[in-house]
Regions:
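Bacterial Sec-dependent N-terminal signal peptides
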Residues: 1-23
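Extended soluble regions of mature proteins
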Residues: 21-218
């Protein structure tokens, strides 16, 4: 009896692994919904309806977050662990280089995030997704819906959810003290030109991560 249970579990796990499609190249488009429930317009309200388009090619990813305020692009090389931020707001353009330690510091709130899984499912962008609850060291929680049908080779572009056994197609985040939700509108496996991950050679003011932190504190 014990052997049959072990065998059944092995078959189930094997079926899950082999049914997953590894995303080595493609594009995922997420829409952002923010509801401050406040009659007075807030900064977060301006982000409602923003989009985050993620381009993946092997170890490389490029996330373009576009709102009425401007565009912020995050380019990650998962081999070197180096990250570049391109910020275009109000006519100003900045290119910020982050070393691996800088990227870890930026996302330190998600260190040691743990997930619990619930038997709650829904379809997002054509994929069956399971509900998970992420819990941070601070005690803060957030809801994620992920699919085990897809698994990116590079999951650094979604730092908070990178330990999930699949791709998050809907997830909560915090903007200020308000909850916001990213939901995937589409997933495609179209080829992505390698030039998409080239860094601009002009037009941007290049600053370090430390300089960007000082600018934010001023």
């Amino acid at each position: 009896m014990k052997k049959s249970i072990v065998l059944s579990c092995f078959i189930f796990l094997a079926a899950t692994v082999f049914s997953q499609k590894r995303i080595t190249e493609g594009v995922i488009v997420y829409n952002l919904v923010v509801n401050t429930n406040d009659s007075t317009p807030k900064l977060a309200d301006g982000l409602d309806g923003a989009t985050n388009t993620v381009y993946i090619k092997g170890r490389l990813s490029r996330s373009e977050f576009v709102s009425i305020y401007g565009t912020q692009t995050t380019i990650i090389d998962n081999k070197t662990k180096n990250v570049t931020l391109l910020k275009e707001y109000g006519g100003k353009k900045y290119m910020i280089t982050l070393l691996p330690a800088d990227w870890t510091e930026t996302n330190k709130k998600y260190d040691s995030v743990s997930f619990s899984f619930e038997n709650d499912y829904k379809t997002i962008a054509g994929y069956n997704c399971r509900k998970a609850i992420g819990k941070l060291k601070s005690g803060e929680t957030f809801i994620v819906y992920y699919t085990t049908d897809l698994l990116p080779d590079n999951q650094e572009f979604q730092y908070s959810n990178k330990t999930l056994p699949g791709l998050a197609l809907e997830y909560e985040t915090t903007i200020g003290n308000k909850k916001a939700v990213f939901t995937a509108a589409s997933v495609s496996f179209n080829p992505v030109p390698i030039a998409k991950f080239d860094l601009p050679k002009s037009g941007f003011r290049v600053i370090t991560y430390e300089e960007s932190k000082k600018a934010r504190s001023n």
